[in-house]
Amino acid sequence: MTKDFKISVSAALISALFSSPYAFANNDEVHFTAVQISPNADPDSHVVIFQPAAEALGGTNALAKSIHSIAVGASAEAAKQAAVAVGAGSIATGVNSVAIGPLSKALGDSAVTYGAASTAQKDGVAIGARAFTSDTGVAVGFNSKVDAKNSVAIGHSSHVAVDHDYSIAIGDRSKTDRKNSVSIGHESLNRQLTHLAAGTKDTDAVNVAQLKKEIEKTQVNANKKSAEVLGIANNYTDSKSAETLENARKEAFDLSNDALDMAKKHSNSVARTTLETAEEHTNKKSAETLARANVYADSKSSHTLQTANSYTDVTVSNSTKKAIRESNQYTDHKFRQLDNRLDKLDTRVDKGLASSAALNSLFQPYGVGKVNFTAGVGGYRSSQALAIGSGYRVNESVALKAGVAYAGSSDVMYNASFNIEW
């Protein structure tokens, strides 16, 4: 009976082939008609080439070229010392190399392959059909491939690419993308690394639980620092606002006092001038009247003296009243003008203070690299003002701000500031 089967080679198998007319594969009994020494064996090297006459063990041309080498299968070749080639077309070319499987190739010293058409180079291990590894690599799985040195590919079609030395690809179709790396997928196939313990050293991986704790800790610290910075900023802003308001009030009061002093001086001057003018006018009129009366009285006879005196008294009285009335009217007019000017001055001072309060309500930008737009209102007594402004914080230490306030009519106030902190 003839059957196709897979065969494992060992010292026990070799002994069985010499000592028994029977061999077993997959628990089926196989009969050998003979076991013969190949004519290709070197008689001086004590090498045995197994070429059983039974078809189940392969065909002809098995070749073992060195001592302790074994070749089993049609065209199997074991080229170096202690090399083993098992399977049709299998090749073991290196010292201590092992090639098991049809068309498998162990192409360097200590290379090991297991699987159809698998290939391993020096010190490499390839397990699985069509598995391939370069020097000092390990490829496990169908069509797994290691093209870099000292690397490992485990899984169906897993691949360590050229120049990706010292890398590992684990899992179906996993691929590496750099040196000294471990890949468990590829660009379009990502996998999770589960049941990972928390890292303890700087070079350990971090699991999600550790990451969450660090994020929470960082958030707490960030909130604490933000609160501290905000408190400092608010305190600074409050102090500066109070200082600015106090300065504005002081300046307004100084301006008001100056204006009042000027108004008083002007009023006194006008009143003095008016009084002097009235007095001069009255004296002049009185002198003219008296002169006329004297002339008139002198021209009359003495019997008309009493009449002249009476007439003179009446005339002088009327002239004096007229002069006083004109003087009072002029003085009243000047004082009304002064009152109007003072009222306008009070209004302008109130509007100025309202504008200053509105400008002081504008916020300074806090975020670095941020531009803000802010608006505010202010009032003083019966006056109100609207202010708008904008600012920009260049960095943590430098900020710019400008604003404009409008209190009605043509009353506009503006300011601009530059802030440096250290």
Swiss-Prot record:
The keyword Transmembrane applies. One of its GO terms (biological process) is cell adhesion. GO terms for molecular function: collagen binding. Gene3D superfamilies: GSPII I/J protein-like (3.30.1300.30), Serralysin-like metalloprotease, C-terminal (2.150.10.10). Residues 206-236 form a coiled coil. Collagen-binding outer membrane protein forming a fibrillar matrix on the bacterial cell surface and phagocytosis resistance. Promotes initial attachment and invasion of eukaryotic cells. Also protects the bacteria by being responsible for agglutination, serum resistance and complement inactivation. Gly-389 plays an important role in this protein; replacing it with increasingly large polar residues decreases expression levels and trimer stability. This is Adhesin YadA. The gene is yadA.
